[in-house]
Amino acid sequence: MASKFFAILSRLKYINRWALMRNTHNENLSEHTLDTAYIAQALVIIDKNHFGGKLNPEHAAVLAMYHDVSEILTGDMPTPVKYFNADLKKAYKAAEKSASEKLINHLPDDMKIEIGGYIDPVCDDEYMPFIKAADRLSAIIKCIEERKTGNREFIAAEETQMKAIKEMNLPAANVFIEEFLPAYSLSLDELN
């Protein structure tokens, strides 16, 4: 039987993020995933070049590509709901785990271990701070883009995400914030 795995993954583009917020531009999971992958790779490169890190930037990028794929089956749960209380957070984590397992089971047997390891990365704990930071930086970038259009809806979200990323104490994220984040506030003409 033909595998449904990549057909299911292609549906990332139909899942919009920030469901409780008024958006001037809807961001889908596919867009967010690509941004997160770029940023995760950059964070690991920064860590290698500035702080002597030993992780593989490409591995970080691929982990980031798969970091939200379970949401194809669970949907993108708004953050205030996802973290409303410990019981809800635990239940959502269990739903994500179950969705990840279901996705992995759609892979042919000869691909389950390699690709499944990206979907449910049990052995990549040292990469997770970089993936989480990239995820938060992608959210901050979305907030900046919305703020640039005059949408005040994302100001508090930007502050919350920035506070959370600072609390991670990930030096590479601080370098990214200083070196790359300011450019996201520029217009197209200013970028050229």
Label the predicted regions:
Residues 1-192:
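Alpha-helical, largely C-terminal catalytic domains
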